[in-house]
UniProtKB/Swiss-Prot annotation:
Species the sequence originates in: Lactobacillus johnsonii (strain CNCM I-12250 / La1 / NCC 533)
Top-rank EC class of the record's enzyme: ligase
UniProt name for this protein: CTP synthase
Sites where the protein binds UTP: S13, K188, T189, K190, P191, T192, Q193, K224
Residues annotated to bind Mg(2+): D71, E141
Molecular function GO terms recorded: ATP binding; CTP synthase activity; glutaminase activity; identical protein binding; metal ion binding
Biological process according to GO: 'de novo' CTP biosynthetic process; pyrimidine nucleobase biosynthetic process
Superkingdom of origin organism: Bacteria
Reactions accelerated catalytically: UTP + L-glutamine + ATP + H2O = CTP + L-glutamate + ADP + phosphate + 2 H(+); L-glutamine + H2O = L-glutamate + NH4(+); UTP + NH4(+) + ATP = CTP + ADP + phosphate + 2 H(+)
Length: 540
């Protein structure tokens, strides 16, 4: 029987529910259990695909092409699992499916209501995740905080789950904040008490608390919280601010969190405890890096940390392999000119231009790529970065001064990057991209193929509607550009590289989505190797 763990939050948002859920997931996985992660987002958008990155952060893409919340990236990187369309559910998706059923007459004339129709659909999504993965444990994070109007249907649905699958198969974990008042030199438990009271008022009694705090919480305060919340004191877990993300699973294990979860759910794991030795080595390496490598990231959304979180994490993963800390210098593409690019790049060991949409900042990207190419600075382009690298090469090597992307200038004579043929007649923006995992065939004797350990074919995740215009392939190849990765039918250019440079590779796909702390993705690994000039130093 699948066990269901529901992770909720209170007091404030951004408590780290996703990291806490992922850390528990990692511990359970390392005990030999099959774990599936799931996120419920209470916004009415169908998915975050059309949302402004400044509001929502990065859009994460799964193997099956789901545009999802960035928390799925945390799940995949920390737990080391693959997520799917069943892993991210929004209010918009729920209402869309319910209304579609109503239009088809599936409800046979019944009045469609939040209870039972919306809550039943939410429960169906939870159950479907279990059925399609055959998991031992489903960990579902409920977005927002308890008491939010938007989250109410989700809270009601998970309350009902306890009755439907049996109380021995459901556990509620509530994450709260225990603030420290510096003026009074004391920690306050009242916000946690009120948050749990709010949760209990809707019929959910938490079985475990995760307390976010600046510093360790005194035992007497834990006893007080236990008294007011009816949560046994041994199931009150601390989540103390830590210098490294990798500390949290180890801190949870030290407090016996995974064992307490297994005991509560009567869950027998194949291993008596989580084997975290490799994780400890990773944590030790991450805290004691001996070198530093500076990478300039030129992008459109650099003011928001979360906008490129998978990219910056992937850079760090590669850094661990080379025992080097990656210092990421983020630069707004719009601010770059021919006059200041030398100053911007003077201390950089490498340049990365990640994905994005729209016309803003494109000329700044092109200027930075030109500088990297001409000065042989290692360069990695991703999605839009690959497209702008192609435009830069056309302008400054082929001499096609009006070369551009059809996205930036549909009327240009030399549209090096054109909209994909099957996307030309699309009127909607959302859900109309080339999304998900697709294969690419790698050319022998290239740096790209070497980066992927001489594999013939790789599978990578995509999110784009524009592609390299094949009419220019021959001219590019004659000028020295190599198409080192293409689709199996040779129609779509996936990867370009300039072989006589130290490292100049750009990919149409998003390699950052498949990077893991203990397994850096191939292009990132090769890029940081070239930028740092250091030998790989394996620690696992």
């Amino acid at each position: 029987m699948t066990k269901y763990i529901f992770v909720t939050g209170g007091v404030v948002s951004s408590l780290g529910k996703g990291i806490s859920a992922s850390s528990l997931g990692r511990l359970l996985k390392n005990r030999g259990l099959k774990v599936t992660m799931q996120k419920f987002d209470p916004y009415i958008n169908i998915d975050p695909g059309t949302m402004n990155p400044y509001q929502h952060g990065e859009v994460y893409v799964t193997d099956d092409g789901t545009e999802a919340d960035l928390d799925l990236g945390h799940y995949e990187r920390i737990v080391d699992v693959r997520t799917s369309k069943y892993s991210n559910v929004t209010t918009g998706k729920i209402y869309q499916e319910v209304l579609d059923k109503e239009r088809r007459g599936d409800y046979h004339g019944a009045t469609v209501q939040v209870i039972p129709h919306i809550t039943d659909m939410i429960k169906k999504k939870i159950m479907r995740a279990a059925l399609t993965t055959d998991s031992d444990v489903i960990i579902s994070e409920i977005g927002g905080t308890v008491g939010d109007i938007e989250s109410t249907p989700f809270m009601e649905a998970i309350r009902q789950m306890r009755r439907e699958v049996g109380e021995e198969n459901v556990m509620y974990i509530h994450c709260t904040l225990v603030p420290y008042l510096h003026a009074a030199h004391e920690m306050k438990t009242k916000p946690t008490q009120h948050s749990v009271a709010e949760l209990r008022s809707i019929g959910i009694q938490p079985n475990m608390l995760v307390l976010r705090a600046e510093k360790p919480i005194a035992q007497e305060l834990k006893n007080k919280i236990s008294t007011f919340t009816d949560v046994p004191v041994d199931r009150i877990i601390e989540s103390i601010d830590a210098p490294s993300l990798f500390d949290l699973p180890l801190a949870f294990q030290a407090q016996g969190m995974d064992q307490k979860v297994c005991d509560f759910l009567h869950l027998e794991s194949p291993k008596p405890e989580a084997d975290m030795e490799a994780w400890k080595k990773l944590d030790e390496r991450a805290k004691n890096l001996k070198n530093e490598t500076t990478i300039t990231l030129v992008g459109k959304y650099v003011e928001l940390e979360d906008a490129y979180i998978s990219v910056t994490d992937a850079l760090q993963h590669a850094g661990y392999l080379y025992d080097t800390k990656i210092k990421v210098n983020k630069v707004q593409a719009e601010d770059i000119t021919e006059d200041n690019i030398a100053e911007i790049m003077k201390d950089s060991d490498g340049l990365i231009v990640p994905g994005g949409f729209g016309t803003r900042g494109l000329e700044g990207m092109i200027t930075s790529i030109k500088y990297a190419r001409e000065h042989d600075i290692p360069f990695l382009g991703i999605c839009l970065g690959m497209q702008m690298a192609s435009v830069e090469f056309a302008r400054n090597v082929l001499g096609l001064k009006d070369a551009n992307s059809a996205e930036a200038n549909p009327d240009t004579k030399n549209n090096i990057i054109d909209i994909m043929a099957d996307k030309r007649d699309e009127e909607n923006i959302g859900g109309t991209l080339r999304l998900g995992l697709y294969p690419a065939t790698l050319k022998k004797g290239t740096k790209t193929r070497e980066a992927y350990d001489d594999q013939d074919v790789i599978q990578e995740r995509h999110r784009h509607r524009y592609e390299f215009n094949n009419e220019y392939r021959e001219a590019f190849e004659k000028a020295g550009m190599v198409f080192s990765g293409v689709s199996p039918d040779n129609h779509l250019v996936e990867i370009i590289e300039i072989p006589n440079k130290k490292f100049f590779i750009a990919a149409q796909y998003h390699p950052e989505f498949l990077s893991r702390p203990q397994r850096p993705e191939g292009l990132f690994k090769a890029f940081i190797g070239a930028a740092s000039g250091l030998p790989a130093q394996h620690f696992n």
